[in-house]
């Protein structure tokens, strides 16, 4: 964003500061971005169906609860920063800098009262209904009219206006990164063992072909001549600005280079980009891709477009070489209905959930495959990286409203990949209108022209792009890696950078108060740092520093010329200053011995301290001042509630009411940590918080420092090196991953979509720097994001839509890189097709994000009611609009057969459960995880996997690196699946629980647990002995394999029948009734009663 006192690109300082959370002069409340959307829910009247009641039905169904609109607005973005929408304010010319560009102003959305498309929403559902005031509820489709932060305004996919914006690519490794603990996406078929040393991704260098070049060699590189007109004014370069970097430099018509001064301009294609001249003929063929084999007769149901895809008379382009022929992918390559595909029969089934019980598959649930031609689908993005809640996009907003399902994307953009194509080229080909990166779903009209699949502009193919470095053939632009891979990484040239890449900087901030010393965490952390010091991502420029604090702040001089570390104490916490800053952040290679000495002595330096106060706020201020010039990663370790100086907090939790549905302490008690996080984001500093506390520490307030700076939160309740050794093991394992995993610095991310679609709300840890540009001072491979979308214009003229995320970052090696993911989905016109393409896991994940926001802006009970109403609304819509005959029971499409189960699991998840057995910090941490975890981990935490493991066999096992990994079937989460003569393993994501029945076989007890009888099982038991038996080898291999697939370390608890941990085990039996929640069958009866009203 802009520096203090400097207006951001294209806007007045006041409005910008308001958006980013700075208090306005008028005294308006401090807010951080778009205001929470109203939960779009149209309570469409549902026809009175046959109210079928089964014997034994739940006698007192829950009445449907209508939420009251919530007045006012939250000053904060919620626990994770509410997913918010942001309307674009009119863009004012910069009064200081003369406008360098001109162009038509973007179309602004009308106020809710004037915009016929924006319908007010009732508070307890997702769908539009007339004559109701817009409450503070979830909203699928439309942005709200105010603004808050951590979730962004809508990013319209209108042909965005030039703004010549190419991502400034932060350079990342040419390799795909460090070996990952997680398995990469593997297509169906035999499992592929993970590589111990993943191969480096291929680097394509047009200037250095793999073999002898074709006759005559490749042509000389011709400089691109992008347009320079842009709607927004360009201020002077802001070299420390994080937001101003998603962009490309452009050549003016006379060939001179103009370096843009903001990320938004470099990356380009944002809301304020300028539309280019495009063909306005609505009948113009919007073909996608390049020549594909002809389809079977069943697919050829429409007339294909013309050979060129664009009427020559309407576009006066030179014909260019005519030898290149390409049949564009037209309507004959896409069926108009799901019935055209040879889907599995169950895809079209209607399921009565009250009669069919075993709907949970015995293998991990796979995402639905979009209804696309196989030649398009094989190029599509891996769903682990990029997936949509609806794999068939509704043609209109009205159709989406009628389906009453959320439309959104879930992303894991920086995931560790075994193979990642990396392109090194002086020319990065992008659409000159919307700045989309060329991708597999564009159309080549001929050898010299390609049509953008997002805004449909026809662009010229640069000369260099005609040469294919893989085949060493000239004249094959459609075979280049950029159009053969939906996920690709570009090495960005220097003109993509606003300032030279900064060195990797790692600053560690340790709490050394008496409480911290008692936990013994310093021993574990310092030892982990010593063990992994050489594995920190970076190069010869890597810098490191340390700060400790109690009631004072301690700095450590580590300059190479010193014989031992020098401790500098600052006792004035009211006005913190940095003593000898040049000695505090030092080159790791040059001062490694001093760093090692400090890490060895630090745990003993404060063993006799009696200081109980904690000045966390002043310590964070000092750390921020130290890191501001370069940016980097700040790792903060805290063990108690801050009690001294700025940011001091007071206990707010009442034990007897700590988890009630009307909890009022889920929002921050101060805006200090949020304001500081915004300052950190502006200087490219991300803050990761490690909270190791058995007492209430107000994570709702402390978590803001990570949420808005794109950091992460780690929570270790009741950490103690002697009393809770299993937490020590967990901290060490997770620190090893944290310290050695890949990292990107100075990152920004933008998501684009096809014209007609609009992105209006973002979820995750970041800060929205401009209307659709996410600022990520650090990006890590374990973070996930979500966005909500609406259909802004009818999609009747297109059969395919595309989504593209572009992540610009600097690698730890100092390379600027752009990682691009592109997803292509079909457009459908019938409600049945929308339901058939529903992705129930993605829908559940997006609803969980929305429910966290609702908890913050309204209340926990409102969030729970909205989750239930999401199921009622969608199944009511299916019953009334799709089913031809009203049958008794609870009829659902096969794609949504698990929707009620997953929503019930969310209601019983720690984030949203009622009762008083969850501490407030634990609930807040669970909500942090919902907002920051990739979908695969979120679903595992929400709906654990249950396996029977006392009879493991090699049948159907995976063979990975000489290991045999058993694959037992997944069981339903109900006690009726348990038996006292067996042993059952529950994988709940962050914890593994092995329940051993009282009558378990002697063979399992002796061959796996190493005990002679049931009573001999030690309590607590948190590890399995490695015995020389086949049974022991199988279960240890299986548990190790489960742990390897995630970036966090799940603790294993072996539970006897009378163990206190048994209650935790049974709490995760989602289908059974608990003291405060319905059983699955009772929940289905409640849903049925509401649907049949």
Swiss-Prot record:
* Annotated region described as Zinc finger-like, given as residue ranges: 431-455
Q: Which GO terms describe its biological process?
A: cholesterol homeostasis; COPII-coated vesicle cargo loading; endoplasmic reticulum to Golgi vesicle-mediated transport; intracellular protein transport; positive regulation of protein secretion; regulation of cholesterol transport
Compartments annotated for it: namely: Cytoplasmic vesicle, COPII-coated vesicle membrane; Endoplasmic reticulum membrane; Cytoplasm, Cytosol
| Start-end of Polar residues biased regions | 112-126, 138-168, 299-328
Regarding the membrane, this protein is recorded as: Peripheral membrane protein
Pfam families, from UniProt?
Gelsolin, Sec23_BS, Sec23_helical, Sec23_trunk, zf-Sec23_Sec24
Q: Which residues bind Zn(2+)?
A: 431, 434, 452, 455
* Chain intervals for the UniProt region annotation (Disordered): 1-29, 60-168, 189-226, 294-328
Q: What does this protein do?
A: Component of the coat protein complex II (COPII) which promotes the formation of transport vesicles from the endoplasmic reticulum (ER). The coat has two main functions, the physical deformation of the endoplasmic reticulum membrane into vesicles and the selection of cargo molecules for their transport to the Golgi complex. Plays a central role in cargo selection within the COPII complex and together with SEC24B may have a different specificity compared to SEC24C and SEC24D. May package preferentially cargos with cytoplasmic DxE or LxxLE motifs and may also recognize conformational epitopes.
Q: What is this protein called?
A: Protein transport protein Sec24A
Source organism: Homo sapiens
